[in-house]
Amino acid sequence: MKKVVCMVLAAVMLMACLAGCSSTPAPTPEDSASAAFKIGGTAPLTGGAAIYGNAVKNAAQIAVDEINAKGGVQFELRYEDDQNDPEKAVNAYNTLKDWGMQISLGSVTSKPCEVTSGDTFADRIFALTPSASSVATTEGKDNQFQMCFTDPNQGSASAQYIADKGLATKVKVAVIWKNDDVYSKGIYETFKAACDTLGIEIVSDTTFADGNDTDFSVQIADAQSKGAELVFLPVYCQPASLILAQAAAAGYEPEWFGVDGMDGILTMKGFDTALAEGVMLLTPFNADSTDERTAAFVKKYQDMYGEVPNQFAADAYDCVYAYAQALEAAGATPDMSAADLCTKMIEQFTSMTFDGLTGNGMTWNEQGQVTKSLKGMVIQNGAYVGLD
């Protein structure tokens, strides 16, 4: 009798369990589609390069909010601080991986990204960096892509632009660059090679490194004594701001020409923007553009963060929108694994055309390098103005 009772009770419990299970509906394709893709990146949110990291994070968040508001593809964004340090970048990346990151915005600056790109390659997480421009970032890694130009392209394009605009036809050129920075070195090397080909005379070629990046009196004196009338600065904002200030104090007033790393110098805390008057640079983004989409982005960024967005911000904004386009075209859903998404993103980015703030008709080759046009800019009255 006890056995019968036990059997009956067991049957009742089994039926209750089955009823409970059947009351919970199975996930539907619609449920998967309405969930969010986890997208993350590492950036210098503190420290000397924070101007770039925060610009990228802020603009990426604007893009995520806009895309999420439209329905369809949804994103959950997370950034971790790497302080522009490769070792800290690895720790930041691992935090994002543990969080469940499915697609990546890579790292903002080149040195950290050269390290984290190796991790995303090994883990088969697709990465699209807005601003890590060194060739080593993507070299030998089929799932690492760039929204920015590579360093070699910036160097040769700068020399060609200077020649085409007649900026160095009758003047001598100086270069001040950072010899322990892959970004600065990569641009310098192709700039110098292009100058040799184009017949541009470099009369002063001086360098600096970490730990020796606050006093530029020797470099400035060398350029000044050799009669350089145009100084090329393939460096970031922090050293550029000091060079401009110290040159002015020394009474040295050449023309200055920089690249995308100097975009943002006007928003540096404590920097006298009058020192940057007349500075020229190449960048894919013009915040002064009357283009409707650009103007709307600039206004929204200013309203939210109180400053004009730089090229790093625009590239990050484009990254998120490019991801949205690629994910939608691939029919991807957030329940897919990072590896499966990686395969689909490689297929999409090597075949699609993308229009964004930093260019129209953008395409990527199999090495992850983007094709788009650079724009000449000059700083006038504390604002960026297009030269072209």
Q: Could you tell me what each predicted segment is?
A:
Residues 22-388:
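Extracytosolic ligand-binding ectodomains
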